[in-house]
């Protein structure tokens, strides 16, 4: 079944255009950089044998948010892999739309066919990067895809995945969700051995480790590389006729496996991507597991050195993942609803209406309202057309940022005692503006309820978080934050209550480092100094 971009666009939100922007089109070809004869597609994006950097040949652009996005956490990326479907690239395109919330600054797809590995990558949304003509240049029944959110605020084309590289065994491609805490240490060692890094992405580290490995097969080289990596990684690889999925031994980031009716195997960061392409969810890729899919033997798996305790990111349930996904074996929707119900039990308040900060606070607010026996209403409207921009806004414009993104509904708020539920407070700037906005719209009282515990520490496992000292809860008490944002009361979901949602056994499988400062995998001293 073939899809055109026009057909695909017809089932997607109107806000997602299909206008290309900053897409890699191989307009420059140094002697060591051999492009495909087809337009828009390259066989080698990264050549590990080259002795000089490719960085001068790539364009770069800096995205700056003008809607206060810097006061929210950001998942760094989402991945998809498909094996055994003649429409693998188009299905990857659809799946990446479903994962767009995990990264909005870049997207890419690599397809394997008789010509080798061919890729299209670009800066912007999935619909900005791909058009019908570009997808036509990605034939093949194996493909991997990636959506990216950069940690530094700079989104450069050379950093957009998937990455393609050549080594002694042949060409390979990789897409990665996570973060390696020993990146700088390993990079320094590899550079001392002669490796030249082309990008500033830690994902490139994997390619160099595979290229340097002495193992005789590609799979053994992947295992060899993973044994050297510390931190979070859910990755998909393409090599020859194989699609390989890998998840770190702690299981920090999600990675699920599904199958289409024609037998095609699909890997994705969330089940919502499977749903969109009519793939049936089968299971998670287990922490420490490597799943190999090839044409001759179907799918098989093996395990690397496992860790006795999983440490899955609890923020996947609280904020990052789509409510219609199953993540870590649990419904995201039901888990968030339980957060809200417990929050209403431990932090009740007399009120007339419960509202949410959309979209991530909505399900918890529904749970809070149901448990409190108070009506839930839409008190804040979110504009989904407030996008990131290349224009550096002035401070005066930044002051209007929340108003651009959120609009109060006066008919719901005026004269009411309002409980407003959000998923988290990061720096506190957005919460301050929301409270002011609700009061300006006539709210008699404003009570903030946060569906996760206070954040006091940065995340090193694939989440773009501010430095610890920039987190308001790391330097202020709850009472001080309440006064700072000028609400009538403020309460967070206690950590013990959060763990209670999962029960005494399952709760030990989650990472709470951003709430406790206790990290399951620590950075080296030099890296911690750089991050502080």
Swiss-Prot record:
Its cofactor is [4Fe-4S] cluster; Mg(2+). InterPro entries: GATase_2_dom, Ntn_hydrolases_N, PRibTrfase_dom, PRTase-like, PurF, PurF_N. This is Amidophosphoribosyltransferase 3, chloroplastic. It is an enzyme of class 2 (transferase). [4Fe-4S] cluster binds at residues 313, 459, 511, 514. Pathway: Purine metabolism; IMP biosynthesis via de novo pathway; N(1)-(5-phospho-D-ribosyl)glycinamide from 5-phospho-alpha-D-ribose 1-diphosphate: step 1/2. Binds 1 [4Fe-4S] cluster per subunit. The active site is at residue 77. One of its GO terms (molecular function) is amidophosphoribosyltransferase activity. Residues 1-59 form a transit peptide. Catalyzes the first committed step of 'de novo' purine biosynthesis from glutamine. In the C-terminal section; belongs to the purine/pyrimidine phosphoribosyltransferase family. It is found in: Plastid, Chloroplast stroma. Residues 77-296 form the Glutamine amidotransferase type-2 domain. One of its GO terms (cellular component) is chloroplast stroma. It catalyses: 5-phospho-beta-D-ribosylamine + L-glutamate + diphosphate = 5-phospho-alpha-D-ribose 1-diphosphate + L-glutamine + H2O. The keyword Metal-binding applies. Its main location: plastid. One of its GO terms (biological process) is purine nucleobase biosynthetic process. Mostly expressed at low levels in leaves, and, to a lower extent, in cotyledons. Its EC number is 2.4.2.14. Keywords: Chloroplast, Glutamine amidotransferase, Glycosyltransferase, Iron, Iron-sulfur, Magnesium, Metal-binding, Plastid, Purine biosynthesis, Transferase, Transit peptide. HAMAP family: PurF. Inhibited by the phenyltriazole acetic acid compound [5-(4-chlorophenyl)-1-isopropyl-1H-[1,2,4]triazol-3-yl]-acetic acid (DAS734), a bleaching herbicide. Repressed by AMP, ADP, ATP and GTP, and slightly by GMP.
């Amino acid at each position: 079944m073939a899809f055109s971009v026009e057909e695909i666009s017809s089932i997607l939100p109107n806000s997602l255009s299909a206008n290309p922007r900053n897409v890699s089109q191989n307009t420059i070809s140094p002697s060591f950089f051999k492009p495909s004869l087809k337009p828009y597609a390259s066989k080698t994006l990264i050549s590990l044998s080259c002795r000089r950097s490719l960085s001068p040949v790539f364009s770069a652009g800096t995205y700056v948010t003008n809607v206060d996005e810097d006061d929210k956490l950001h998942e760094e990326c989402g991945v998809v892999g498909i094996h055994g479907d003649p429409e693998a690239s188009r299905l990857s395109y659809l799946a990446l739309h479903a994962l767009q919330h995990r990264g909005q600054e870049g997207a890419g797809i690599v397809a394997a066919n008789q010509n080798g590995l061919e890729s299209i990558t670009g800066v912007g949304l999935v619909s900005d990067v791909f058009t019908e003509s570009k997808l036509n240049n990605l034939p093949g029944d194996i493909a991997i895809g990636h959506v990216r959110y950069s940690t530094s605020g700079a989104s450069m084309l050379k950093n957009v995945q998937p990455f393609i590289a050549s080594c002694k065994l042949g060409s390979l491609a990789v897409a990665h969700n996570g973060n390696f805490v020993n990146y700088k240490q390993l990079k320094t060692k590899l550079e001392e051995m002669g490796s030249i890094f082309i990008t500033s992405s830690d994902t490139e580290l994997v390619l160099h480790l595979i290229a340097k490995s002495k193992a005789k097969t590609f799979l053994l080289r992947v295992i060899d590389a993973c044994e050297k990596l510390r931190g979070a990684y859910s990755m998909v690889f393409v090599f020859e006729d194989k699609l390989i999925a890998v998840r770190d031994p702690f299981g920090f980031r999600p990675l699920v496996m599904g199958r289409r009716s024609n037998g095609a195997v699909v890997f994705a960061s969330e089940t919502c991507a499977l749903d969109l392409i009519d793939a049936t969810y089968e299971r998670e890729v287990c922490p420490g597991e490597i799943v190999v899919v090839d044409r001759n033997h179907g799918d098989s798996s093996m395990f690397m050195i496992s860790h006795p305790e999983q440490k899955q990111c609890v923020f996947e349930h609280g904020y990052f993942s789509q409510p219609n996904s199953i993540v870590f074996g649990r419904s995201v929707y039901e888990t968030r609803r339980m957060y809200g119900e417990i929050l209403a039990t431990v932090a009740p308040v007399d009120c007339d209406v419960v509202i949410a900060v959309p979209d991530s606070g909505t399900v918890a607010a529904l749970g809070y309202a149901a448990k409190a026996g108070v009506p839930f209403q839409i008190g804040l409207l979110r504009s989904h057309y407030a996008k990131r921009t290349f224009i550096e806004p002035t401070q005066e414009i930044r002051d209007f940022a929340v108003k651009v993104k959120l609009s109060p509904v006066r008919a719901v708020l005026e004269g009411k005692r309002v409980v407003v539920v959000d998923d988290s407070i990061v720096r506190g700037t957005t919460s301050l503006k929301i409270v002011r906005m609700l009061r300006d719209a006539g709210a008699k009282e404003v009570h903030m309820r946060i569906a996760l515990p206070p954040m006091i520490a940065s995340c090193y496992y694939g989440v773009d978080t501010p430095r610890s000292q920039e987190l308001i809860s790391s330097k202020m008490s709850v009472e001080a934050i309440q006064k700072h944002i000028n609400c009538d009361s403020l309460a967070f979901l206690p950590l013990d209550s959060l763990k209670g949602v999962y029960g005494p056994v399952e709760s030990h499988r989650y990472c709470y480092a951003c709430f406790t400062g206790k990290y399951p995998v620590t950075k080296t001293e030099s890296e911690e100094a750089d991050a502080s």
